[in-house]
Amino acid sequence: MISIYLFMAFFIANLLGYGGGPASIPLMFEEVVNRYSWLSNDQFSNMLALANALPGPIATKIAAYVGYSAGGWPGFLIALIATVVPSALALIVLLRIIQRFRQSPVIKGMTLSVQPVIAVMMLILTWQIGADGIKAIGWVQSIVITGISLLAMTKFKMHPAFLIIAAFLYGGLVIPYL
């Protein structure tokens, strides 16, 4: 039964995750943490941080880890297939439709109107993960880390992977001694 649940969870999340891997993360979170409890909020947050630091598409890394954690090697394969297949099929079908009707106000309206929904989904996920961080290390540490990260990415164009590594190091070397 776990195989069916894994397939459906990742198939639906990736089928509806318009905008790519990052847009499907809140949908995966809903399935993985809230619906099936395969991971806790903390486990999902840690996995997401590490997955962002590693090369490759985020959605496939999340599917691989969760699939393996919940269902071993068969779960790994099922979750990966469920992640890749809807995107590949949707890409083929939608690109043909969009290319054919690219000047249509309906197509333009559809692609533009979904963007605020994706933004809200990502904000909710950010809030949930941020709230856990605040509970774990407090407001001051969270604000300092957030501020430094924001500055490093916007002003200095630092790659997020370096910030994730720095946060891991800070969390392991400094926070335990505060």
Curated annotation (Swiss-Prot):
Its main location: membrane. It comes from the Bacteria. It is a multi-pass membrane protein. The chain crosses the membrane at residues 1-21, 47-67, 75-95, 117-137, 158-178. It is found in: Cell membrane. InterPro entries: CHR_Transporter (IPR052518), Chromate_transpt (IPR003370). GO terms for molecular function: chromate transmembrane transporter activity. The keyword rRNA processing does not apply. It holds the Pfam family Chromate_transp. Keywords: Cell membrane, Membrane, Transmembrane, Transmembrane helix. GO terms for cellular component: plasma membrane. Belongs to the chromate ion transporter (CHR) (TC 2.A.51) family. PANTHER family: CHROMATE TRANSPORT PROTEIN-RELATED, CHROMATE TRANSPORTER. This is Uncharacterized transporter YwrA. It comes from Bacillus subtilis (strain 168).
